[in-house]
Structure formats: structure tokens, C-alpha cells
Amino acid sequence: MKDLDWSNLSFGYMPTDYNVRCCYRNGAWGEIEICSDEYIHMHMAATCLHYGQEAFEGLKAYRCPDGKVRVFRMDENAARLQSTCRGILMPEVPTALFEEMVKKVVRLNQEYIPTYESGATLYIRPLLIGTSPQVGVHPATEYMFLIFVTPVGPYFKGGFSTNPYVIIREYDRSAPLGTGKYKVGGNYAASLYANKMAHDLGYDCEFYLDAKEKKYIDECGAANFFGIKNNTYVTPKSTSILPSITNKSLMQLAEDMGLKVERRQVPEEELATFEEAGACGTAAVISPISKIDDLENKKSYVISKDGKPGPISTQLYNKLRGIQYGTEPDIHNWTTVIIE
């Protein structure tokens, strides 16, 4: 293993030794290439640069206490990328190719997989871009699919602790019938200013309401929202929300624990009724919410009265992390051992 301070990694980019690439030309995917270059040479008129023809994914590799390295639900990442491809007219990356490239890039960079004790992980970033030149709004004819990896610490510096959020109405993450359900860079560009506003106001993250009516809960920054009340796991249903693999997994685990699961429209005022709430996603796993302030209407929805994560959120977090690290039974066959 590399001699790194694994316990003090930030959630940021660190160079590793290799990335893997595969190009799409003449209607077919080519061979997988192993590359040590961190840079891409492409045409200045590439569609990814002008018309937003790019999609990405995020998943992690975990060094486990049994010495094995596992990844979590990479078939779901492949399926979500394929959905994005259909949405913005890019060729779908076959699941077998996606999984082979994930395995290859993790094995090539295994010296960068953090120790189990550090709580850090190897973040895996698949990226698909349109590379052929195009002037005029049309899909590319050539594409590059690449995957790089980088060791990361927790997304939120405080780890599993509560964080304050603020409702931002001046900006929308995505349009009601736009690209919100796809993992494309444009959605994140749309969130940059709102995220800066939230940080400038002293909050960890921005909180979005639906773009059409500003009545219903949408997303927590770059993560899905869930709330717990009356032994029920509640999460918003909307065409503009990215389908979170973490949220999908938490819903299943909540059912396994005997909770009722509701995926539906969640009015803003219902925030006052939740006993627990959190943001969930690959990067953060679960970020419990302490409060959500509505500055415009001078309201504060205090979720955690004692400032600590709630018992059900804690149980869900520990259960999911246990499956990812191989310390809990993987009854749903979510993990894949990449290195024995």
C-alpha cells in the first residue's frame, strides 16, 4: 500500500497510477485501454464541451476487515448510466463492459485503497463523454468511456453527525421535465450558486423544493432526502430527482427492519412532523439533518432536538456500512468481491 495518511484524507481528487478507457466508434465499443495519463486529448468542438453530452457515475471500493475488497451494487450504477445515456442520446455502456472496467481499474490501483480502520474509501468515477466535433445541436458519433479512481475521506468532515440545511427558493437544481433524473454535469452546474449561498449563510448544504410549485421536497443538495416518523421511512417521489442507489438500498433495509416505506410527494410543511431526517447518497452515505431553516418564511424545522443522529438513521447507516464492508450478512447480494 502507498504510504499515505489514510485517516486524514479529504473528499477530493488525488492522482493514482492508472485509469481505464474504452472508445465508441463506427457504432461499436472498442477494446479496453489502460492509461497512466491523467489528461484527455479531444477536439475543441466535442459535443461534451458545447452541448452537455456527458454523464458520470460514482461508486466506492471498500477494503474490508476480512482482507477482501468489495464494491457495492455496481450493476445499479451501470443501469443508471444506461438510463442517462437514453435520456441524452448517447450509446449505452453494456453492463458487462462497465463491470469489467470497474474491476480492472480497482485492481490496477489497489495500493490506493485506504485501510479499513481509516474509514476512508476508494472513490470510483465512471465518465462518458461525446468526443466527435459538432457545430449544431446534435448527438456525437464518437464517445469515450473512462473510469478513474481516487482515495477519499468522508464527504462531510464531521462524518456521521447532524448537519444544518437551508431552503433555497431562488434557484432550482433541475426543471420538472428536464434532466434531473439523469446524472449529468449540468444538474451540478445548476446547483453551484445555491450551494455557495448555503455555505455563505453558515449551512452545510442547500435544500431544494420542487421547481414547479415550490411546495414539495425535492433534494438535499446533491443527495436524496428521507424522513422517519411513525415507524415509516418517507422519501420524495419526483421526475426531477436522481434515483439514488443508496436511497433504494436504505428503503429495502428499512423494510427488512419492519418499517413501512412510502415514496411519494412530501409537502414542505411535513418537515415539522419528522422524528428523524437525512440526506443520502454514495458520497455521504447518510448525512443526518439537525434542522432545515426556511429563512424566507422565518421558519426553522428542528429535526434533531439533541443535535445527534436518530436511532433509526443510525441503525440504517450501520447496517448499510456493515454490508459494504462485509461485516453484515449480504442477503440481497449487493456486494461484489473484486480482490480476494
What are these regions (language model features)?
Residues P114-I129:
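Extended, Lys/Arg-enriched charged tracts that mediate electrostatic binding to polyanionic substrates
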Residues M1-V105, L127, Q134-E340:
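Helix-start/capping segments and mature chain N-termini
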